[in-house]
Amino acid sequence: MPGVTEDTLYQGRVKLFQPEKGFRASTDSLVLAAALPEKLNGSALEIGCGCGGALLTAAYRLSSMQLTGVDIDAGMTALASQSVTANGFQDRVNIETGNAAEWVRDKENQFDVVFANPPYFEPGRISAPGAEKAAAYLESLSLDGWIKAMAFAVKPRAPIVIIHRAAELARILSVLDRLTGEIRVLPIASKRDEEARRVLVRGRKGLKRGQVHLLSPLITHTEDGQPSARLAAIRQGDAIDW
């Protein structure tokens, strides 16, 4: 793949190969990895793992877990596999290429946690580098289908964790409400007085419906634009207590 960079996360402790342009690891990737409960054991699945930004940092944090990442883009999974080897995670992290909805068909109730960072764009409004691949994602699986695939693969009573656009929260909750319980929502805002643009959402499969818990927002930056203490801790590998 042309235009590949070799970067590091967690202050140099995790190596990551990723495209120079297009889908790259971001704060969203680190926040998603930090949102996974620290005491998890067993197996984890990331749907739409891309080049592995969230998957590899999750593997670093959750050292007793077996992790699988699946993505439709063979170029991205090749980079993720390269990063797995560079970090010495071959015994614990498996990368596969495929359409998530098809890939999970024989994986019902298999994973102890399933997490995802679904694409944020909308049809007809894609302008970032890698637009053709972005369009392929949209055609392959809707947001509703993405969440249903996650819920299908996770074990009963186990969590699914999503980071997505805050504007899609109602849609996310409408699907999760039918499939999960103990739903928690953590808004993510750049600054204290700004509107949240992202949300972390967690639900546990098969539990009874109940109140949705809306938490105080995670603020990523100070008023002068510097990383907040919480974001700095996440970048070091700390978990989010939510």
PLM features: residue spans?
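Class I SAM-dependent transferase core
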Residues: 1-39
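Conserved beta-strand segments of alpha/beta enzyme cores
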Residues: 15, 66, 92-94, 181-184
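Conserved Class I SAM-dependent methyltransferase catalytic core
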Residues: 21, 25, 141-196
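Residue-level signal for inorganic ion chemistry
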Residues: 32, 117, 146, 203
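Conserved SAM/SAH cofactor-binding pocket of Class I
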Residues: 34-127
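Mobile active-site "lid"/loop adjacent to the S-adenosyl-L-methionine
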Residues: 118-145, 149
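SAM/dcSAM-binding transferase cores
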Residues: 195-242
